[in-house]
């Protein structure tokens, strides 16, 4: 999975928006490897494209990503210290360049291990399954 990082020798300052996106990716998929993390980032990009809002606004929309339910940035910044954070920050920095086709332009997903599917997934067929996440285009 190619992510464009630009000049690898520059030091980047991480913006608040990039932190929000990276934390969302980490909270949702850090155990899913690079493919799973890319997939979640692609869903964020797809929602931003469809809803005409920024990717960080997508992440913070009420009840969209459970990691943010009742939490603030300071409560979750510790995730930026896990080994997968470097890749998540790279995805966050380049979110508008990601291939949304990677997940079939999916705008929803859920963990496949959930005992009960979310209400919106009932009767829907996933466009893709990557790791332990099923992806849907609704």
Describe the function of each predicted region:
Residues 4-138:
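Bacterial extracytoplasmic/cell-wall-associated proteins, especially those involved in peptidoglycan
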């Amino acid at each position: 999975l190619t992510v464009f990082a630009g000049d690898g020798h520059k030091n980047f300052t991480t913006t608040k928006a990039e932190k929000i996106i990276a934390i969302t990716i980490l909270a949702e998929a850090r155990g899913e490897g690079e493919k799973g993390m890319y997939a979640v980032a692609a869903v964020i990009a797809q929602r931003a494209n469809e809803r005409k809002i920024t990717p960080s606004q997508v992440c913070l929309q009420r009840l969209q990503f459970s990691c943010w339910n009742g939490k603030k940035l300071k409560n979750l910044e510790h995730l930026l210290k896990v080994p997968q954070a470097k890749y998540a920050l790279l995805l966050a920095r380049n979110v508008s360049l990601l291939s949304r086709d990677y997940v079939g332009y999916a705008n929803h997903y859920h963990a496949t291990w959930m005992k009960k599917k979310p209400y919106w997934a009932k009767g829907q067929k996933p466009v893709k399954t990557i790791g332990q996440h099923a992806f849907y285009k609704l």
